[in-house]
Swiss-Prot record:
It is found in: Secreted. It comes from Cruziohyla calcarifer (Splendid leaf frog). GO terms for biological process: defense response. GO terms for cellular component: extracellular region. Keywords: Amidation, Amphibian defense peptide, Antimicrobial, Cleavage on pair of basic residues, Secreted. Signal peptide: none annotated. Residues 31-32 form a propeptide. This is Cruzioseptin-9.
Length: 32
């Protein structure tokens, strides 16, 4: 069962990183 939590944690981190990248892209485009 612990593996299931590991998968959720991994996916959560990946989604969070993707969201941060998207925000950074928007900020960079706004500055140009």
């Amino acid at each position: 069962k612990r593996g299931f939590l590991d998968v959720i944690t991994h996916v959560g981190k990946a989604v969070g990183k993707a969201a941060l990248n998207a925000v950074n892209e928007m900020v960079n485009q706004g500055e140009q």
